């Protein structure tokens, strides 16, 4: 409901602001208030709740009209010092001086945002002062632009490009999915800002000048062009008082930017573009995609209607369009662009496939359009519509917050509406929009007509075929070399002297210690005395005629329950690569009397999905043993008990007779895995380096590493061509399934207290009897790798990911805490500057991993190789041989404790608490570890550095482009490659 703005309410409004309206969103139990700053017109949305994790975000409408990366580089440079805080790196310094639960900055296609979250009020005030000054009074030092954006340096007398964003975007644009998105947008949006890459195209970034950056800041970073959003238990008045005092009072009215509608195509177009691959084998590497430009996103009824259309067409494998794309025969998987994108000014709709060939472009287009015609020709089944509405309600009600803070998730959901001068309250309060849609659904052809109007009859349609090109990467590298050579030929001695002087000035700036007294901070005295751990109840129910533990947690879940079955995994299953394949199948193949298409629709109608996964940890006191639990998961609205029945059915009666479907699922897994490698290169590098340092590390390298991707590709080829190989696979999966049915079980239930007894009773009734094959089974043994070579893996990428690993101790060992602090200390004090600021990598650092029982250094999207490994070792010598400051130790500890204390969603905290108990991470264990962290000393850091790092030889690993093969061989790496 919307609340009238009364005189009583207005008395609580800060005098610099005008209250426009208030609206209570019942489904979320939040009061949304919209305000306008009287002088500048800045908009403020406050989401009032009783949560003590308060969230702040300020966003600007940024609309670049080129691909130089102006908005992205400005996002970085604005955080490099401001009027009140003239230190070189306030953003990363505040991460260390804070108890934040989230700090970041984002550059989207047409907005830039600066969010943070914290549970500590003093910390909130500190971060708010730094963020507001960075946003509205950034210094924009030319040397920071050179560091973060783009610069030329001389190496052996020849010019080279350097810059953090330059290397970041080289890494980002090596991913085929990123190339697909940006090349498609180039055609779908011929004239507006979406035509360009706001993050920056590496070939265009060198064209950006410092003066252009400053001009962009002056136009876009003004309160009149800003949206403020806040969430939590602080009042809007006290927040606005700070906005006014710290920033807004200095401004008069400025320009507000508005988005422009795209010029519409008169007829559909077809285009072919290419992307780089490092192989001459081009078979099955083409992407096909169809995209439509839809109306503006401001019509909430149409927006929700198109979401329903997306659900009808694409929700699951039984949905007609997804089913066609998955079974068409000319592609290996659906593509990365699928469904409605309503985050821009005008909505878009995508569908596509990957793992195809260029000659199938017409078949793809004709097949998609035929499906759309079939669906649009008749009324949509009302049961399917109800199932999609159920998914929308479930998504609306669910309280997330286990990755991104819950309040920030809500804010980001509504931000696009506010940025485009639309109404974000309509997005938060979807119940009222659903009521409008239900009125429209009384016309049985309403959704069918939306398909006809906005897809079939819409001339603004782009079909793109993205084909692999083994020469593209080489051509891009040669073009960059030629450009730099041309620059070098024109350089006079005076030009070279100027470049050298600027390089020296940047190095001096990077080496000059910041005056940390200029920045606010929290200290260890502000850390909560105790670790908050959710407490549950241990019940007993009967499962398969045996007493079975049920872990019950009461939580404010907003009308949703979460049910899991927890199965202790036998050791031979843990190490089997086939186990991961079984988890791909559950919920995706049929079960019992239901084929997979029927089961897909059932899941959509009664649950938030069915899942099978694994929770794996090293034993707390023995690195050679694994604590392993299979997790069967579902969630649903509390009135829908059918999800409990469906979870048991899908696991107990999982079918292995749908051969085409099983091959299809494994093929999809392989194709999607291949397309996502470059975003996780640092994780793979650390996994490779530490692969033999614990039993779990070895298992993960063997079963989830890059070698496992090659193994899966070979397996898919075998079972596609050889019936006997397929039969062997199914026999192995059946053996694993049989063992899991026999294995000991527990249950986990998270729900609201008043619903718990009914749900416990239902779980008892459903799981009372279990069909178990008690025959003993032996699994196929797989040979485990055990060498400690320095290993390099070659993938499709333009930058490197480096890692070094040292054998460390189990997490229960007293040295685990100082090793954790050591990692943060080296990152803060040395590695960030050496690897990111000076080396030009997008990121780098160190970590102690209690599961791999290793201490690991890493870099991310790194232009260097050998120099980075030298920096890893130099960081240890820096610690041991230079004077260290106590404040650096406090900062390292603060960050670790903040991470440990970070809240999750109500359900997420309960699930985390239960899993911790399963793996012997008891409350006493967790509190002891936290207490040890708080008491680590500098002497402890030096001791463990000598013991674990100086006295060992590290195992090194690199994930790198194919072009680095020769250099890596010269450095002594054993070369592997992703096929």
Regions found by a protein language model. Name each.
Residues 2-55:
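Non-catalytic terminal extensions that flank enzyme cores
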Residues 47-50, 57-59, 166, 170, ...:
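His/Glu-based metal-binding/catalytic segments typifying zinc-dependent metallopeptidases
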Residues 53-63, 89-137, 144-152, 178-203, ...:
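M16 family metallopeptidases and their MPP-like homologs
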Residues 70, 74-78, 582:
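Active-site His/Glu-centered metal-binding helix of metallohydrolases
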Residues 152-225, 229-247, 251-277, 282-284, ...:
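Hydrophobic, small-residue-rich alpha-helical packing segments that form membrane-like cores
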Residues 214-246, 729-763, 953-954:
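Non-catalytic, conformational "gating/processing" segments within enzyme and secreted inhibitor domains
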Residues 215-217, 227, 236-255, 378, ...:
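Extended, regular secondary-structure scaffolds
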Residues 934-979:
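In a subset of proteins, long, contiguous C-terminal domains/tails are tracked
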């Amino acid at each position: 409901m919307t609340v009238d703005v009364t005189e009583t309410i207005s008395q609580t409004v800060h005098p610099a602001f005008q209250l426009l309206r208030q609206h209570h969103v019942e489904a979320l139990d939040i009061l949304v208030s919209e305000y306008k700053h009287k002088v500048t017109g800045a908009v403020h949305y406050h989401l009032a709740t009783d949560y003590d994790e308060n969230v702040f975000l300020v966003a600007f409408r940024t609309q670049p009209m080129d691909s130089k990366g102006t908005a992205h580089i400005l996002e970085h440079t604005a955080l490099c010092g401001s009027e009140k805080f003239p230190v070189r790196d306030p953003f990363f310094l505040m991460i260390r001086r804070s108890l934040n639960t989230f700090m970041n900055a984002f550059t989207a296609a047409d907005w830039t945002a600066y969010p943070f979250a914290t549970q500590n009020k003093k910390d909130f005030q500190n971060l708010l002062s730094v963020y507001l000054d960075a946003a509205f009074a950034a210094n924009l030092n030319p040397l920071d632009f050179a560091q973060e954006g783009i610069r030329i340096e001389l190496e052996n007398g020849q010019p080279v490009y350097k810059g953090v964003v330059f290397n970041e975007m080289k890494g980002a644009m090596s991913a085929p999915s990123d190339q697909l998105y940006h090349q498609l947008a180039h055609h779908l949006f011929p004239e507006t800002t979406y035509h360009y890459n706001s993050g920056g195209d590496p070939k265009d970034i060198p064209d950006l000048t410092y003066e252009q950056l400053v001009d962009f800041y002056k136009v876009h970073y003004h309160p009149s062009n800003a949206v403020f959003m806040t969430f939590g238990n602080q009042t809007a008045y006290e927040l606005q008082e700070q906005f006014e005092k710290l920033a807004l009072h200095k401004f008069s009215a400025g320009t507000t930017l508005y988005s422009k509608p795209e010029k519409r195509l008169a007829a559909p177009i077809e285009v072919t573009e290419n992307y780089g691959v490092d192989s001459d084998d081009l078979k099955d590497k083409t992407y096909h995609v169809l995209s439509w430009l839809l109306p503006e996103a401001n019509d909430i009824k149409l927006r929700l209607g198109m979401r329903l259309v997306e659900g009808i067409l694409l929700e699951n494998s039984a949905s007609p369009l997804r089913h066609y794309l998955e079974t068409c025969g000319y592609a290996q998987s659906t593509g990365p662009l699928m469904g409605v994108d309503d985050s821009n000014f005008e909505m878009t709709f995508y569908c596509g496939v990957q793992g195809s060939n260029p000659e199938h472009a017409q078949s793809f287009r004709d097949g998609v359009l035929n499906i759309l015609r079939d669906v649009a020709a008749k009324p949509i089944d009302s049961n399917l519509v109800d199932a999609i509405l159920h998914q929308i309600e479930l998504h609306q009600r669910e309280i997330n917050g286990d990755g991104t803070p819950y309040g920030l998730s809500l804010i980001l959901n509504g931000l696009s509406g506010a940025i485009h001068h639309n109404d974000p309250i309509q997005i938060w309060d979807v119940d009222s929009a659903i009521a409008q849609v239900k009125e429209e659904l009384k016309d049985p052809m309403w959704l069918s007509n939306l398909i006809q109007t906005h897809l079939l009859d819409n001339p603004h349609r782009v079909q793109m075929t993205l084909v692999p090109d083994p020469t593209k990467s080489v051509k891009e590298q040669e073009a960059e070399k030629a450009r730099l050579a041309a620059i070098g030929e024109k350089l006079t001695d005076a030009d070279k002297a100027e470049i050298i002087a600027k390089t020296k000035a940047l190095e001096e700036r990077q080496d000059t210690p910041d005056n940390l007294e200029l920045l606010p901070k929290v200290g260890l005295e502000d850390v909560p005395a105790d670790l908050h751990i959710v407490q549950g109840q241990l019940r007993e129910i009967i499962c398969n005629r045996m007493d079975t533990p049920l872990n019950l947690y009461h939580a404010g879940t907003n009308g949703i329950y979460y049910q899991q079955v927890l199965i202790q995994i036998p050791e031979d299953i843990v190490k089997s690569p086939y186990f991961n394949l079984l988890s791909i199948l559950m919920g995706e193949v049929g079960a019992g009397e239901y084929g997979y298409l029927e089961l897909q629709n059932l899941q959509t109608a009664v649950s938030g999905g069915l899942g099978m996964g694994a929770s794996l940890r090293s034993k707390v006191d023995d690195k050679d043993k694994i604590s392993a639990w299979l997790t069967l998961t579902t969630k649903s609205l509390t009135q829908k008990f059918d999800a409990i029945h469906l979870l048991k059915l899908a696991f107990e009666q999982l079918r292995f007779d749908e051969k085409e479907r099983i091959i299809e699922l494994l093929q999809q897994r392989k194709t999607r895995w291949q397309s996502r490698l470059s975003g996780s290169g640092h994780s793979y590098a650390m996994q490779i380096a530490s692969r033999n340092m614990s039993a779990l590390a070895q298992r993960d390298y063997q079963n989830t590493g890059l070698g496992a991707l090659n193994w899966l590709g070979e397996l898919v080829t075998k079972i596609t061509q050889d019936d006997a190989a397929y039969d062997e696979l199914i026999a192995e999966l059946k053996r694993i399934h049989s063992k899991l049915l026999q294995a000991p079980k527990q249950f986990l239930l998270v729900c609201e207290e008043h619903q718990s007894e009914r749900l416990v009773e239902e779980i008892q009734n459903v799981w009372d009897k279990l069909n178990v094959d008690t025959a003993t089974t032996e699994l196929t043994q797989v040979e485990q790798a055990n060498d400690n070579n320095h290993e390099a893996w070659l993938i499709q990428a333009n930058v490197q990911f480096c890692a070094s690993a040292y054998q460390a101790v189990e997490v229960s060992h007293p040295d685990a805490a100082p090793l954790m602090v050591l990692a943060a200390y080296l990152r803060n004090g040395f590695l960030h500057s050496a690897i990111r600021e000076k080396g030009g990598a997008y990121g780098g650092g160190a970590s102690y991993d209690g599961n791999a029982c290793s201490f690991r250094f890493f870099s991310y999207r790194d232009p260097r190789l050998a120099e980075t490994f030298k920096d890893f070792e130099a960081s240890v010598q820096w610690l041991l041989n230079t004077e260290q400051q106590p404040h650096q130790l406090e900062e390292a500890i603060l960050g670790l404790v903040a991470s440990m204390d970070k809240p999750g969603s109500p359900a997420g905290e309960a699930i985390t608490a239960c899993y911790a108990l399963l793996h012997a991470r008891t409350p006493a264990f967790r509190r002891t570890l936290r207490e040890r962290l708080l008491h680590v000393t500098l002497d402890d850091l030096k001791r463990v550095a000598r013991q674990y790092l100086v006295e060992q030889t590290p195992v090194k690993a690199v994930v790198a482009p194919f072009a680095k093969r020769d250099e890596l061989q010269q450095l002594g790496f054993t070369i592997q490659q992703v096929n």
